[in-house]
Structure formats: structure tokens, C-alpha cells
Swiss-Prot record:
Needed cofactors: Mg(2+)
Source organism per UniProt: Rhizobium rhizogenes (strain K84 / ATCC BAA-868) (Agrobacterium radiobacter)
Chain's gene name: cobS
Residue spans crossing the bilayer: 40-60, 117-137, 147-167, 186-206, 209-229
Function: Joins adenosylcobinamide-GDP and alpha-ribazole to generate adenosylcobalamin (Ado-cobalamin). Also synthesizes adenosylcobalamin 5'-phosphate from adenosylcobinamide-GDP and alpha-ribazole 5'-phosphate.
Main location (coarse class): membrane
Keywords: Cell inner membrane, Cell membrane, Cobalamin biosynthesis, Magnesium, Membrane, Transferase, Transmembrane, Transmembrane helix
A Pfam family reported for this protein in Swiss-Prot or TrEMBL: CobS
EC number(s) per entry: 2.7.8.26
GO cellular component, as recorded: plasma membrane
Record field: catalytic activity: alpha-ribazole + adenosylcob(III)inamide-GDP = adenosylcob(III)alamin + GMP + H(+); alpha-ribazole 5'-phosphate + adenosylcob(III)inamide-GDP = adenosylcob(III)alamin 5'-phosphate + GMP + H(+)
HAMAP family referenced in this protein's UniProt entry, alphabetically: CobS
GO molecular-function terms, A-Z: adenosylcobinamide-GDP ribazoletransferase activity; cobalamin 5'-phosphate synthase activity
Name recorded for this polypeptide: Adenosylcobinamide-GDP ribazoletransferase
Amino acid sequence: MNIREYTSDVARAVAFLSRIPVPASFFEGDDGKLARVSRAFPLAGLLIALPAAITFGVLLAFDADPLMAALLALAIQTVTTGALHEDGLSDTADGLGGGKDRDRALAIMKDSRIGTYGAVALILSFGLRAAALAAIGRGLAPLDAALTIPAAAVLSRGAMVWHWYALPAAKPDGVAASAGKPDYGPMQIALIAALILSAFLLWPSLRLPAFVLCLLVTVVAAFLFTRHVRQRLSGHTGDTIGAAQQICEIAAFCTLAMCV
């Protein structure tokens, strides 16, 4: 693997997955395709999660209420990402919840208006993550608690790449189809990076059993969601890729909260 190319992929992934400004030099010769760039999603997720993690850790170190610290960290994370994945979760919930068949579900997902299912999904997403982070903040030292945020970001970004790889594009003219689909190589690199980075972040404070359980629950969540999307839509969309990230991040946080 060419390190220079991988560095460029990380920068492009950060630009795609967040609102963090990236120097234009990293986009020279860029064709806009994300198939190869997807291998850098886990590391990019770690970098994107740093502002939220620092916020969470500093607030806990100053004895802030863990729930308040968790909500502020999630607010920082949402601003950093531009609610990219939350938007995908909301649209996917509306489509799968309100669409009686595949075509109707895809049409609903394309509609920018939020429906009941989407609103409930967002409330549950923020509520579950905030509750889990608050529990983590009460059970771990500030630094160890803060490291769970990039760890969940890493695992969920790896899971979204696998979801993207495992399914064909549901719409040939959709955004996800135009961005390209990861090949086996980039997908494998993304999963290996997610495994190594999450182990480095979690193992020192939570030890092997908690890390393995978190990994297993995240894998199961990704598999079950991907299977459901395959049955309902016969393929992925940009929205389902974002929803996969959110679902797996929730799964990781909730599992870690039960292990502290």
C-alpha cells in the first residue's frame, strides 16, 4: 500500500465525512470516486471524532455532569459531521417504516422532508448514545471515557464500508452508485484498520472481554441491518450507508456502557 496515496485518501475521507476543511492539494487529480477512499474511513472517523472526544474528556475532568458532557460531545460531533449520518438514518427510517414496497420506500427516502419514523429514529439515536456515554463517563476515568468516542467512530465507519461493499446499489442513478462501490481490497483494509484502531483505543481500559463483546455486537448489528436492507431494497443507498454507521455506533456505545 502506497503511504502517500493512503494519506490522500484519509484527507479526502475527512472532507467527505465531515465539514473539516482540507487543503485543495489533496484533491489534485481526484475523480470524485470513493471506492478506494473508503479504505481510509475508519482512520478518518477517528480524526473526525477527536473534537467530541476532547470535549467529553475535558468536561468530565472538571466534574461536569456526565449526561451534560455526553450531550455536548454529541452536539460537537453533529456539527463536525454536518449530521451526515443522522440524515441517512432519518431518511432510511422513513423509507423502511413508511414504504410498503421497494419503489415506495426508495421514493420516500429521496424526499428531503422528515416523517414520523425519521423523527423517532433521530430521537432514539441521540437518546441512546447520550445515555450510553453518560454511563461510560460515570464508570471510567475521563481519558478512558473520552477514548470510547473515537473507538465507536472507528468501528462504525468500518461497518458502513462493509455494508456498502456487501450490497449492490439499489438505484443505478443514485448518489451511492455514482460514487462507486468499494472493491474487496479497500473493504478489507477498512475492516483491519477498524479492528486495530479500536483495539488500541479500548483494550487498555476495558480489557479483552469488553472489547470482544463490543466488536461482536457491532458486527451483529451491521449484519442484521444489511440483511434487512437487502430484503427490503435489494441494495444500498447513500442513506442506508449512513444509517449503518449510526446503528453500529449506537450498538458499540450501548455495549461499552454495559461493560464499565
